[in-house]
Amino acid sequence: MSKKVIGILGGMGPLATADLFQKITLHTVAACDQAHPRVCIDSNTDIADRTAALLHGGEDPVPEMIKSAKRLESIGADFLIMPCNTAHNYYGQVCEAVTIPVLHMIALTRDALKERGVKCAGLLATDGTVQTGIYQRTIEQSVVALLTPDSAADQAAVMDVIYNGGKAGDLTHDVAAFRAACEHLLARGAEVLILGCTELPPAFELYRLDYPNVDPTLELALGAIRAAGCETK
């Protein structure tokens, strides 16, 4: 079977896009360059902030997302992936703009939770992802219960790490409040934490956070490798 071309609709943000590409590369079974899937990346940093648009009337990110989707299709992508959880609120609009499939990161995460036998997970995500309920609607279609931070302070700590830590590239950011938010979710019964913003997997590495987790970026990478006709490891 010939390999299919992966199109990454990226730039939301650039570090998350790089993290996804690295995971595709690291998790492909390949003894030579030619065994890897071909990947086209549009790291479109003109895409407006998704949370600001969803919750605060900010600039609509969809026009630029659609430009990127069409651009990737025009240069030969066989399917698309979007390394941004909050952007999946616009998944349907992106799908309508192209004639190629778009993998769904949150659905792939749901499937991974079910496969691991997780009964209760805690969600770490942007205000836009949490308040629009996109994870709740997708995850709770299965048997997995989903917890979100139960205090404004804990959710603010998550947003702080995403925007002022990971996105800002602050290597010495104080993550004490974020650690507390993670520990509160685990104390309430979460077996794992869903890293429901693509800035969080790099942040977990950067700040050496070792809580049990499911990484949606990794699940998207694995799904893309398989969809491209390659083997995963």
Positions of predicted regions on the chain:
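Non-catalytic structural scaffold of enzyme domains
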Residues: 1-233
